[in-house]
Amino acid sequence: MIVWSIANQKGGVGKTTTTVTLAGLISERKKRVLLVDTDPHASLSTYLNFDSEQLPASLFDLFQLQTVNKETVKPLIVKTQFENMDLIPAHMSLATLDRVMGNRGGMGLVLKKALDALADEYDYVLIDCPPILGVMMVNALAASHRVLIPVQTEFLAMKGLERMMRTLQIMQKSRSSNFNLTIIPTMYDKRTRASLETLQELKIRYSDQVWASAVPIDTKFRDASLKHMPASFYAKNCRGVFAYKTLLTYLERLEQDEQA
């Protein structure tokens, strides 16, 4: 089972779009994918047409379990309307988790334990991270084989990337192995100087970690979200979906190389 976290400490860079679109493409390849919404705003859950206030359980309940195993974790999972795609939804109560958990030991590995228990149930897990460093982001990163960092191709997004990289450096100190990172340029508009220069700067500063291509601006992403569908199901031939197909192939090759 491959676990990817989609993270950036700046909002509006395409985290949820990246998560849903990749999940749609993975499910179309007949692979089982579990989505985990760790953001109290529950954007991923809402995208997939779930109202977390109306659900019997959410990710928050994972942190209330006395024992974490397959039998206790599976009730937190909801099936989406799409084949091979399930979700552990978020709830606004996640915003209180840092205060509720306090300094309890081992809380940074709860999600990893839960996903380890589900290892034979899914081929991929995609974790949509919150924009702030706290218990949930720590859990997501600790559980991940790779961190995908969407970065809007504009100057301010570069600042957000710098903060994210500092966060990863801090967390690296408690890991025995380095984070595998892939920076994903998003919302690219080749007509604008800002996009052109930002993409160039990304490739110069993070040459070995940035995906060489970019996800273009595409209104089909917005239209797909209104229909609560992955863009690959809504407009499979649009340029944005084509970019994510190329990205997924690239990421799969990276995983294969690392396992070789």
State the predicted function of each range.
Residues 1-260:
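P-loop NTP-binding core
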